[in-house]
Regions:
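Alpha-helical transmembrane segments and their immediate juxtamembrane cytosolic regions
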Residues: 1-223
Length: 223
């Protein structure tokens, strides 16, 4: 789907660029269809696929008690890559850009200061991001007492948010490179917000306003 969207976008741009030229309809169509030389390989949908696929494999093959250690390893390892590879600079010397150009080719990257926001290396912390979500989901399924569930979820959210902002003094919160602190803070805020929704809807019973959002909640990838 992601590659299809990227191709369609390139098709439209090529079609529009040929609108003023005196060529036949079939020639214009052919040149617009065969635009794979500059198609962007990675994107949001592709990242979702990579992260969900990696998380599924890890969840099926690794003992779940070791997943938190893997999350820490992925985030720390990625931070070391950023520090040693000029990863916080928006230029061609950035390790993220270097790897993407070497593997994907510059013609197949998102053109934004040499950095592809959905590049290969930045998928590492994104996988850790999804793994944190897996751990939170596992907690929600295993803990039956709703009060204990809320306490643990609020605690996790608070700790992650505080830790992320604290670490941001040495590792800036940056979505474009998907910095470790960005993953930690967003997971913390998301966990806290989820706990708040559970408290409002399941504990207090204010459910009528949430009916509209149920379809989005149970079908997020389809939407």
């Amino acid at each position: 789907i992601g590659l299809g969207i990227a191709w369609f976008s390139m098709f439209c741009r090529t079609w529009n660029s040929l609108s003023g030229e005196e060529i036949s309809f079939l020639s214009r169509l052919g040149q617009s269809v065969w635009t794979f030389d500059h198609i962007r390989i990675l994107g949001v949908m592709q990242r979702l696929a990579l992260c969900y696929g990696a998380t599924a494999i890890i969840a099926l093959t690794m003992k779940h008690k070791y997943i938190p250690y893997l999350i820490v390893t992925l985030l720390v390892g990625y931070f070391i890559l950023l520090i040693t590879g000029n990863g916080f600079e928006y230029n061609d010397t950035n390790i993220l850009s270097v790897v993407d150009r070497a593997v994907l080719g510059e013609a197949h990257m998102y053109k934004d200061n040499g950095i592809d926001p959905e590049g290969l290396l930045s998928t590492i912390p994104a996988i850790a991001h999804v793994l944190i979500g897996f751990c939170v989901g596992k907690l929600l399924m295993e803990v039956k007492d709703i009060n204990e569930k809320l306490e643990r979820l609020f605690l996790i959210g608070t700790i992650l948010t505080f830790l992320g902002f604290l670490l941001s003094y040495g590792c800036p919160i940056n979505k474009k490179i998907w910095s470790p602190t960005f993953a930690i803070v967003t997971c913390g805020l998301g966990s806290s917000f989820l706990a708040l929704l559970i408290w409002i809807i399941d504990v207090k019973g204010y459910k009528s306003w949430s009916r509209f959002f149920e379809s989005f909640g149970v079908n997020p990838l389809f939407i």
